Amino acid sequence: MSASPTIKPTPAHNAAPTEPPIGMAGTTLAAWMSHSRWLSVGGALMLLAMLPTFALSLLHRQQFNGIDAYDKPLKFQLSLGIYLLCLAWMRGYLTPAGRARRVALLTDVVPTVAAFGEMAYILWRASRGEASHFNIATPLASALYGLMGVGALLLVAASGVLAWLLRRHASPGLNAAFLTSLRHGLWLTMILGGVAGIYLSGQTGHAVGAALGGVTNDAFGLPLSGWSRTGSDLRVPHFLGIHAMQFLPLFGWAASRWWPEPRAILSVHGAAVAYALLTVLAFVQAAAGVPLLFGL
């Protein structure tokens, strides 16, 4: 009786684990919910809230500083919604053990609660035609503004905590260049966005340069953003800092597709330095009272 032939393992048997798709930590709603129910639901609700806010802007005509008072709530709802959903997406690159750590609450529950607290205050002030930021007219207004500032710090701190968690608990097999871009973007959001926000909150307004002939009325701002064209605007560097967590991962995703890993990683480092310098330059320009487009 002849012996049974020995079955040799095929390459498929010894194949390395499939690398997770670069830039995709699960694209279904169920996947995002598994990463963070708080962030996913919170981000979606924040974006959906733009619909009733827009309706309010049509039904309740309220002006503030030359523009519709509901422009600011709409912009913040868009920005905060994207921020929360980005955190939910990036948490998908953590191992289950990383997401289960107690400190991970700072990237989940805490920023969601802080975002809705800040949004409620901004919307309430808008409905009254009053300033939400820089409003220290009364002791109550000063206290509420300070509380909103604490919430804003908790929001940007969440990005730094997530960057630290991705350093220690990133999913195995993740492309190194893309992972580097995630961490760089999150750190820059916390540092640049946080520093610009702290400086901005200590001023009497976002516009600089009125004494140099600039116009601080927001009615003369750029389309969509509302940034001043005649005076400088401290919101520009704050915007760049806060959104580093979207720009750099997008660059890292592209770099990991175009170049070999060592070159892609080096390009991500270079992009992070360039982005930081651009943000610092925008801050120096704004603080000096020079318009973003030099008055064009």
Predicted regions and their residues:
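Membrane-interfacial entry segments at the cytosolic side of transmembrane helices
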Residues: 176-183, 261-270
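Membrane-interfacial catalytic/cofactor-binding modules of polytopic membrane enzymes
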Residues: 201-244
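Short, Lys/Arg-rich, polar N-terminal cytosolic tail immediately upstream
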Residues: 1-35
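Hydrophobic cores of alpha-helical transmembrane segments in multi-pass integral membrane proteins
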Residues: 38-58, 70-93, 108-126, 147-164, ...
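Membrane-helix interface/capping segments
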Residues: 90-103
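Non-cytosolic membrane-interface motifs at loop->transmembrane helix junctions
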Residues: 64-73, 134-147, 175-180, 294-296
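Juxtamembrane boundary at the C-terminal end of a transmembrane helix
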Residues: 284-296
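Aromatic-rich transmembrane-lumenal/periplasmic boundary elements in polytopic membrane proteins
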Residues: 177-212
